[in-house]
């Protein structure tokens, strides 16, 4: 058994898979959890208490759309009572000004508002819902309450040319942080990859604009940018490394090391309804599976980067190499890197439609 290097720092509370949006890159599984199997309020409250005792500092409320939970105010209160910093990741569609005030009064520390584009047409094309005007209204309401704000712009081929317009939206808001996060290609993102992955020219131009904005807004707005894995030389340490920093609880209570872990065949996931959180973190089969280095194959097992990127994303290795224990194929040292290069060659020579 490989002991975790630390206790988890954050708990990702996936409260529900229900969502008013139908984004073509959604990271939720292709088979969603039914409302009838969602954890009740009291179970989540117990999870928050156990998480705090385990050393968790922050609870990230996500989904789906976490505001679809009628008990969202009670959940925020429970997490705050446990001593956790509470972050809400939302589409903003279920919000109104009164609801926002109630969320903050219940103890909400931070809100991340997602945007699918810089204009209504792009947002509707991607999400399948008329949502953009509501998000802009939410930005105005956020100016009136004391809560930290991050704007999440999910970047892909269809909106990457709108970076300047996205920055204008952010600069007119109360946000202290912007995240330009390129789509991660698993779940629905993988299914629609050929229509979403930007071209090299698009990516390079966007990075120039983001770099200039970082300099111009330094000290005012913090900007973070996550580039597509496919264009990287080395893989990122997915989730900070398998079972190292984060723990995700699904709507039905399964504990996962990462969002997409359920696609890996043969893994059995413990449920918070049946086992204590600490036991799951320290000794459950799923969290043990790719923790440490003993499972690594060549070239990772002798590579100097094995303690930096931990062989990359296990789910990406499965999707592209057919083996969850393989080197992440985005790595230039991976024997499967040519598969990535074939995808990039096609992307950079065509204009596919969603």
What are these regions (language model features)?
Residues 31, 64, 116, 183, ...:
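Flexible loop residues that form catalytic
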Residues 3-4, 29, 262-354:
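Flexible mid-to-C-terminal extensions adjoining Fe-S/redox cofactors in radical SAM and related proteins
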Residues 39, 70, 130, 158-161, ...:
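Residue-level signal for the nucleotide or nucleotide-sugar donor/cofactor binding architecture
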Residues 34, 85, 101, 105-110, ...:
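Radical SAM enzyme [4Fe-4S]-AdoMet core and its adjacent flexible, acidic
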Residues 1-110:
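Conserved alpha-helical substructure of the radical SAM core
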Residues 29, 64, 154-156, 318:
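Short strand-loop junctions, especially beta-strand C-caps/beta-turns
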Residues 1-2, 232-236, 289:
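Short, P/G- and charge-enriched loop/turn segments at secondary-structure junctions
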């Amino acid at each position: 058994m490989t002991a975790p290097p630390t206790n988890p720092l954050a708990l990702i509370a996936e409260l529900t898979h229900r969502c008013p949006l139908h984004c073509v890159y959604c990271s939720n599984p292709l088979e969603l959890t039914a409302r009838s199997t969602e954890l009740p309020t009291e179970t989540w409250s117990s999870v928050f208490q156990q998480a705090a005792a385990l050393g968790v500092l922050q609870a990230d409320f996500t989904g789906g759309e976490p505001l679809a939970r009628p008990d969202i105010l009670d959940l925020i209160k429970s997490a705050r009572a446990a001593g956790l910093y509470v972050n809400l990741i939302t589409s903003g569609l279920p919000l109104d000004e009164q609801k926002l005030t109630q969320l903050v009064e219940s103890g909400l520390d931070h809100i991340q508002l997602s945007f699918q584009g810089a204009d209504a047409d792009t947002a509707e094309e991607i999400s399948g819902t008329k949502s953009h005007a509501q998000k802009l209204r939410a930005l105005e309401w956020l100016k009136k309450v004391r809560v930290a704000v991050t704007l999440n712009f999910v970047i892909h081929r269809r909106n990457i040319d709108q970076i300047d317009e996205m920055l204008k939206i952010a600069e007119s808001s109360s946000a202290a942080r912007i995240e330009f996060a390129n789509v991660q290609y698993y779940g629905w993102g993988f299914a629609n990859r050929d229509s979403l992955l930007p071209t090299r020219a698009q990516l390079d131009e966007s990075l120039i604009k983001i770099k200039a904005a970082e300099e111009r807004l330094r000290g005012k707005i913090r900007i973070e940018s996550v580039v597509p894995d496919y264009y990287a030389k080395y893989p990122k340490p997915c989730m900070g490394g398998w079972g190292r920093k984060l723990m995700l609880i699904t709507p039905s209570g399964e504990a996962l090391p990462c969002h997409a872990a359920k696609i890996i065949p043969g893994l059995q996931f413990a449920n918070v309804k049946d086992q204590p959180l600490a036991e799951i973190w320290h000794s459950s089969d799923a969290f043990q599976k790719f923790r440490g280095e003993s499972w690594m194959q060549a070239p990772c097992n002798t590579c100097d980067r094995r303690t930096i990127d931990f062989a990359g994303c296990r789910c990406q290795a499965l999707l592209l190499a057919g083996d969850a224990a393989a080197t992440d194929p985005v790595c230039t040292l991976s024997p499967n890197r040519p598969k990535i290069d074939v995808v990039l060659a096609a992307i950079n020579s065509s204009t596919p439609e969603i």
